[in-house]
UniProtKB/Swiss-Prot annotation:
Belongs to the universal ribosomal protein uL16 family. Part of the 50S ribosomal subunit. This is Large ribosomal subunit protein uL16. Pfam families: Ribosomal_L16. GO terms for cellular component: cytosolic large ribosomal subunit. Keywords: Ribonucleoprotein, Ribosomal protein, RNA-binding, rRNA-binding, tRNA-binding. Signal peptide: none annotated. It comes from Clostridium botulinum (strain Eklund 17B / Type B). CDD domains: Ribosomal_L16_L10e. InterPro entries: Ribosomal_uL16, Ribosomal_uL16_bact-type, Ribosomal_uL16_CS, Ribosomal_uL16_dom, Ribosomal_uL16_sf. GO terms for molecular function: rRNA binding; structural constituent of ribosome; tRNA binding. Binds 23S rRNA and is also seen to make contacts with the A and possibly P site tRNAs.
Amino acid sequence: MLMPKRVKHRKVQRGRMKGRATRGNFLAYGDFGLQATTCGWITSNQIEAARIAINRYIKRGGKLWIKIFPDKPVTEKPAETRMGSGKGSPEYWVAVVKPDRVVFELSGVTEDVAREAMRLASHKLPVRTKFVTRRDFEEMGGEK
């Protein structure tokens, strides 16, 4: 499971997800990618499940990059606890994902294999996604 080794603040506020992603919104390493089209929190367990789904399908036939990292702690109070008495303890970690953020990148496989692997991974994620290729970004205006 992905989580930070150490953090400056143990508990953080929930925050808002406004606007689109301004960083991580293009393919930096691979030839194919999975791009989020809606916003949401992706937990470390969901990232791991999607990673396993991709690796099982490509069978060591390519390289996978995970472009998000769960660095936000989510707190929960124990069950049947009365209101008040402070904020709960950190239970799991999430990555905040905005629209246009590239979540996974893949190279070393054909487009058909990459498309199916990303489709399997998208079923594990709580955000809507789309399959993108390097060609898509070159047509849009050559972002890197």
